[in-house]
Amino acid sequence: MNIWEIATNYYQYFLRGTRTTILISLLTVFCGSILGCLIAFMRLSKFKPLEKFASIYITVIRGTPMLVQLYIVYYQLDFISYPTGTLFDVDLERALACIIALSINSSAYVAEIIRAGIQAVDKGQMEGARSCGMTNAQAMRYVVMPQAVKNILPAIGNEFVTMVKETSIIQYLGIGDLMYNNGIVVTSTYNPLPCYYISAIIYLALNIILGKGLNIFEGRLRKSER
């Protein structure tokens, strides 16, 4: 079978896998952004134990392979009781393990993105807000963060693009993402090369679409600064 025949005869597998890949990526970036925001503020904290914990957390997560983290989380969940079932036709136990592991991994990178975005804001902004009678929390909320967000959001968008590709490791837990379904088609056709070409094209198309969306978003952010 050639690439066109495989694409037309097995398109439902590729579509199903693409849906799962996008879903896991969205949930991962959402959860990772929330956790990353918390870690970033801990990293910026003047309370040394919190700052130290965040620093160690980021070092450990960024310094170990994502696949190892995925297996650790998956086997660790065996000791935790939680609801069983399915999430969009995906086994809930495995889906939770993937979302948790990928979110933890993403949070370490998001934390550094947020920290860098906040530190990129001129320190005079904070000092000016404080001189106007604002507390640290008020100055951060009303003065620093609105400016930092313009630096942070495009980078988090790039993290989403990266995560779409990195979710390919969840196939090792039997999650029906794009690469898992690609494997099913390879087994059925005994012709792996066209299958991998199709998967590569889908990943490329997803990232091009996301990249274009990010460019439009960044353009609007720049216009709002004028």
Feature-to-residue mapping (PLM):
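Transmembrane alpha-helices and adjacent helix-loop boundaries
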Residues: 1-226
